[in-house]
Amino acid sequence: MAIHVKNNIHWVGQRDWEVRDFHGTEYKTLQGSSYNSYLIREEKTVLIDTVDHKFSRDFVQNLMAEVDLNTIDYIVINHAEEDHAGALSELMARIPNTPIYCTHNAIDSITGHHHHPEWHFHTVKTGDTLDIGNGKQLIFIETPMLHWPDSMMTYMTEDAVLFSNDAFGQHYCDEHLFNDEVDQTELFEQCQRYFANILTPFSRLVTAKIHEVLGFNLPLSMVATSHGVVWRDDPAQIIHLYLKWADSYQEDRITLFYDTMSNNTRMMADAIAQGINDVDPGVAVKIYNVARHDKNEILTQVFRSKGVLVGSSTMNNVMMPKVAAMLEEITGLRFQNKKASAFGSYGWNGGAVDRIQTRLMDAGFETTLALKTKWRPDGSALEICREHGREIARQWALHPLDDTPARRVISPVKQTTVAPQSASAPAESACGCSEVAAPQSTAQPAAQSGNGCMQCSVCQWIYDPALGEPMQDVTPGTMWSDVPDSFLCPECGLGKDVFNPIR
């Protein structure tokens, strides 16, 4: 059933109440989702995007009930992923000569998915327009890597509607279409979850692209997303939230997550959290077992936090697999402006904590205060864990704290191994079980330093002045300041503004 959006614009998309996995099984869509397609009927009839491929037949049948397919003059594909363009094959089988407007990269993606290079593609770039009659135009805005290289937005003049693609959306299903009609708590939780899990790696691009769009000084009455609600009540609010979230976002919050074999690491997590609360009762603290909790919720909490503590029992001298997988996710999301610490229990060798600490450093976190406990923590060891939490609270505080401790105990920063391990057999410490690792360096290791190298913040490709970039006529010995402004990253195709110096 079509839903009226504004004037001659109607929603002709598909709700998906049952979907629980997205991007394979990487994103849990616990609130379902929607695939938003829009039909514009001015002097020219335009279809913007389709729906997920599994709804192809339903989509085309519903569209035929709304409009004669042969009257569709143009199809605009903002993004070629299958949840946006999945019904193209079913639709184009009926109207094969209808022109498709998309970016150059989208042609490759669409052809790769649907295998119809004969379709009539029209490549568009930022600033290109399409006259649709009645004094109205569509303006196209390329948004590469938000979140695919082929992505773009489409703006409709006069009606002042921005068809924003994945940006500003959320995997959220509701019978109501507009943001002012749905549960606001649910809505904004899903917006933040979406940003944290999908768009965080591209935060710098989000900021740059939003400012580029705002620089056009176009009026805005609605933001029509590809998933979730249409923003009609104060549509600028979600844009301002994106700018906030993209700017090294953090709250006064600490997240702990762990996996454990015998509950020993869980006991450590509980005690550390108690210690944090002793010193800073105002900070929000959440604890998650990665084997039992929703992964995307944990990642959202890490995104919100000023710091994260990651724990694991040692198994085969490495961390437990679910913790390793979570750290791989975190590395890819490239969170900014966050501190981190590793902790964990072990029996004869505590290799997991060392590996976690290294992975956190590699992921760009400022690391401090790793903590190891041997065997099952007793009362003395748990008190060391609490003091570890107190020291974390002091070091990570965003505001002045009361310097008077709740209880006077030995600081874990000064603690060393109580009883050394024998080379032949594990020795138990004097307190029964605990050891505190030496504080780790807070400096992130750099691949190169002091040589003028620049690293792409999106794909991590490194420009080395000693090598230059011959494919773009940048000769060896060319310093970054002398590289032409037209330079593009050879890996992701983005410009100089996404590069940062390697220090």
Swiss-Prot record:
Q: Which UniProt keywords apply?
A: Cytoplasm, Electron transport, Flavoprotein, FMN, Iron, Metal-binding, Oxidoreductase, Transport
The entry marks the following residues as binding FMN, namely: 260-264, 342-369
Q: Where in the cell is it found?
A: Cytoplasm
Taken from the UniProt entry, a GO cellular component term is:
cytoplasm
Q: What is its main location?
A: cytoplasm
Q: What residue spans carry the region label Zinc metallo-hydrolase? A: 30-210
Q: PROSITE patterns this protein is in?
A: FLAVODOXIN_LIKE, RUBREDOXIN_LIKE
Give the range the annotation lists for the signal sequence. none
The residues listed in the UniProt record as binding Fe cation 3, with positions renumbered to this chain, are C456, C459, C489, C492
Task: Name the family the entry cites.
Answer: In the N-terminal section; belongs to the zinc metallo-hydrolase group 3 family.
| Protein name from the UniProt record | Anaerobic nitric oxide reductase flavorubredoxin
**What species does this protein belong to?**
Pectobacterium carotovorum subsp. carotovorum (strain PC1)
Source lineage: Bacteria, Pseudomonadati, Pseudomonadota, Gammaproteobacteria, Enterobacterales
Gene encoding it? norV
